[in-house]
């Protein structure tokens, strides 16, 4: 085991604070509408230009191991805020820096670190409760667009495209962000339920110009097994022939005689039919078949629940307004399932997603939920260069997380105003001694730090702006984008409550741990000079004689 170096008391705290300041100073320049860019060096390719706090934080590693410990702890603040709400990483870093700086000053002056931490914790609990009181519901498209715009550093096009996507696929719908091919951002929406299974035979195609199968108001047969014997399908096909409606078969597989007979019947125009494989594998396939059944108002024909294909009737079939099948995908549009059952199924899947510990399972469950709830939207980010593309894509992802958080917990006045109002409304927090009281003061002072930093980045004097805002009431605040004061909600400057709450909670949690740190232990680096030399290689000098080998 290698030797360790240990720092105690003030020596440890000074080093730790130095690391906190290096990371926080690099991150906080990105805050607000007039925040600056940070350029990140990459080992290969062009450097990355970003205004995303967590991206900057992740790149920072310091040479001094004790300073690096401080930096890594603040990096954890940004990371946790990003995981919880997807945004607010810079705000969390600014809050943490303020609490740590003031807290360590108080410790150096002889105050009890544990009481300071208790005071900070009490203030934050009161602040979170007050934030919930200030929060307003965010449900209309305009408010969603405003939240997206603010999070994307005042880029209105990003806010609008996210609001449109949410309007099209619903609050539970899946919205993904991809790199586009054009210069402008594009929105691609797949409405209805789409799964990645295409037609089993090209002979089912009835739209040769697009190479697809289109079925209008079809019946949908769902079978949880392989179908190879046509006799099993005869009762259904005979019933269908009388209705004159088309049929979509979704089964584990359709093969051999069954597939050949369906193709022949389809080509002769006796029955309009198409067959696709069921999506997924194993238990996931069973679950997705059940999803389709609920969406279309049908029943999954499965032998394990005592249903046989030969005995199936038209009542067991689902229906939809339209089905489109390409060689890769099947889309069921406007299934005729009962709305109450669909909502119950979505709620059930949502619970499973929340309880799941696997990121992959969570993602798949959210996809299923979206397909039932409305559809999938893809935002294709457009840019002129690869460097701009990466920067813009990161902003779109941030804005998307922020709008989801806003829909979930509501919004408060943006621009750091909500925290200033919360600090003024908390009033007297119950404490048992002067040190705890000072801890409360530290937390309340830190709540002004984001507003001060936004003003500083806009070229204004932070303390002057903070005083002007404190003298106002309600949503009155400073719009750094155009250097004016007014009602933040009316100006469309909104922050998701969840983002502000998460930033405050994570910042105070990690900062509290740093204030109560009394010793730091780091590894002493191995001295490279101490390694054994490569003795004995000197004899290689005789190799000079190899010249005669030529």
Curated annotation (Swiss-Prot):
Highest taxon of source: Bacteria
Gene3D superfamilies found in the cross-reference section: GroEL, GroEL-like equatorial domain, TCP-1-like chaperonin intermediate domain
Swiss-Prot/TrEMBL keywords: ATP-binding, Chaperone, Cytoplasm, Isomerase, Nucleotide-binding
Single Gene Ontology BP annotation: protein refolding
InterPro entries: Chaperonin_Cpn60_CS, Cpn60/GroEL, Cpn60/GroEL/TCP-1, GroEL-like_apical_dom_sf, GROEL-like_equatorial_sf, TCP-1-like_intermed_sf
Keyword Isomerase among UniProt keywords: yes
One GO molecular-function entry: unfolded protein binding
Cellular localisation: Cytoplasm
Family under the similarity heading: Belongs to the chaperonin (HSP60) family.
Function: Together with its co-chaperonin GroES, plays an essential role in assisting protein folding. The GroEL-GroES system forms a nano-cage that allows encapsulation of the non-native substrate proteins and provides a physical environment optimized to promote and accelerate protein folding.
Protein name, UniProt field: Chaperonin GroEL
Organism (species): Shewanella piezotolerans (strain WP3 / JCM 13877)
Lineage: Bacteria, Pseudomonadati, Pseudomonadota, Gammaproteobacteria, Alteromonadales
């Amino acid at each position: 085991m290698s030797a360790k170096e240990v720092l105690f008391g003030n020596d440890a705290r000074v080093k730790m604070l130095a690391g906190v300041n290096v990371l926080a100073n690099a991150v906080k320049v990105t805050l607000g509408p007039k925040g600056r860019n940070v350029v990140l060096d990459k080992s290969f390719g062009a450097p990355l230009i970003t205004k995303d706090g967590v991206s900057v934080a992740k790149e920072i590693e310091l040479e001094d191991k004790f300073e690096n410990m401080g930096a890594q702890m603040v990096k954890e603040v940004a990371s946790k805020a990003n995981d919880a709400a997807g945004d607010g990483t810079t705000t969390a870093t600014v809050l943490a820096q303020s609490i740590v700086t003031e807290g360590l000053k108080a410790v150096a002056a002889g105050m009890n670190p544990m009481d300071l931490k208790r005071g900070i914790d009490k203030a934050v609990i009161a602040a979170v409760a007050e934030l919930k009181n200030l929060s307003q519901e965010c449900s209309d498209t305009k408010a969603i667009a405003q939240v997206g715009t603010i999070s994307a550093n005042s880029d209105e096009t990003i806010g609008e495209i996210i609001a449109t996507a949410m309007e099209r696929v619903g609050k539970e719908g899946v919205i993904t962000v991809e790199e586009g091919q054009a210069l402008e951002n594009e929105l691609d929406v797949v409405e209805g339920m789409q799964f990645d299974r295409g037609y089993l035979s090209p002979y089912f195609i009835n739209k040769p110009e697009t190479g697809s199968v289109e079925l209008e108001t079809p019946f949908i047969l769902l079978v949880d097994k392989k179908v190879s014997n046509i006799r099993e399908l005869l009762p259904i096909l005979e019933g269908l022939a009388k209705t004159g409606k088309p049929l979509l078969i979704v089964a584990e597989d359709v093969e051999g005689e069954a597939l050949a007979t369906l193709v022949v019947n389809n080509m002769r125009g006796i029955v309009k039919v198409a067959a696709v494989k069921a999506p997924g594998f194993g238990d996931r396939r069973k679950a997705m078949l059940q999803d389709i059944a609920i969406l279309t108002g049908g029943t999954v024909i499965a032998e394990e629940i005592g249903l046989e294909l030969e005995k199936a009737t038209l009542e067991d079939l689902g229906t939809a307004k339209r089905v489109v099948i390409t060689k890769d995908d099947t889309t069921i549009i406007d299934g005729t399932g009962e709305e109450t059952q669909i909502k119950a199924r979505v709620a059930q899947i949502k619970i499973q997603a929340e309880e799941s510990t696997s990121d992959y399972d969570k993602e798949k469950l959210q996809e299923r939920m979206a397909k039932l709830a409305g559809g999938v939207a893809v935002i294709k980010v457009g840019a002129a260069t690869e460097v701009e593309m990466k920067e813009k894509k990161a902003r779109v992802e941030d804005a998307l997380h922020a709008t989801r958080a806003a829909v979930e917990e509501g919004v408060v006045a943006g621009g750091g105003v909500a925290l200033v109002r919360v600090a003024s409304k908390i009033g007297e927090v119950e404490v048992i001694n002067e040190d705890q009281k000072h801890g409360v003061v530290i937390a309340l002072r830190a709540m002004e730090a984001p507003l001060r930093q936004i003003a500083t980045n806009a070229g204004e004097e932070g303390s002057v702006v903070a005083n002007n805002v404190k003298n106002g009431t309600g949503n009155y605040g400073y719009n750094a984008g155009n250097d004016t004061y007014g009602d933040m909600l009316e100006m469309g400057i909104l922050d998701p409550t969840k983002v502000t709450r998460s930033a405050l909670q994570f910042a105070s949690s990690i900062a509290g741990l740093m204030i109560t740190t009394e010793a730091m232990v780091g590894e002493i680096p191995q001295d490279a000079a101490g390694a054994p030399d490569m003795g004995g290689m000197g004899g290689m000098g005789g190799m000079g004689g190899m010249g005669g080998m030529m």
